[in-house]
Amino acid sequence: TATITDCVAADLKLYRDRGFEPTEIQADGEYNAVKTLFKDVHFSICSADDHVPEAERAIRTVKETVRATIHGMPYKRLPRVMVRELVTFAERSINMLPHSDGVSDTMSPDTIVTGRPRMDYRTMNLEFGTYVQVYDGTSNDVKSRTLGAIALNSTGNANGDHYFMSLATGERLHRRSWMPLPLSDLAITRVEAIATKE
């Protein structure tokens, strides 16, 4: 319930910050538990075996994008951080261009809702799952200044920063500098080992 509450509150804030005033949320039965917490919005809850068609279609599109991306990568298993970021990557990719059935022919859904200008393709120039060496800071010792990582997703900021998964720890990193390299069998094995260990 706390997760749904936090998500609804964050979404309402995002819309209101852009000058939109949501009056209705169409949802399934899981939202019954939180609808009384949001008095200023009407929750239209569908019946037990029913779904909101627009939401189901959007979910199906994200799943298809995720599935296609997974089948284009050489990994047999993916760590949780890669799966989470892949869903975000799919959603962001879908929403970065105007939709043919959308409210605008020139503005993307992302631009309409967030106010950010259309994402510059230069910030999306790194394919999900690419092996890279990321810059890991400067020091006066002889330790390596780069770290092996797997590209996850653009952060969406104007600097072109990206999120990566560290091959050393499996944790998500936020970096501005990287060097793409050919994907080695060792990197593939390491990604799968991180996934197996979770």
Model-inferred region functions:
Residues T1-E198:
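Nucleic-acid-interacting cores, centered on viral/eukaryotic replication and modification enzymes
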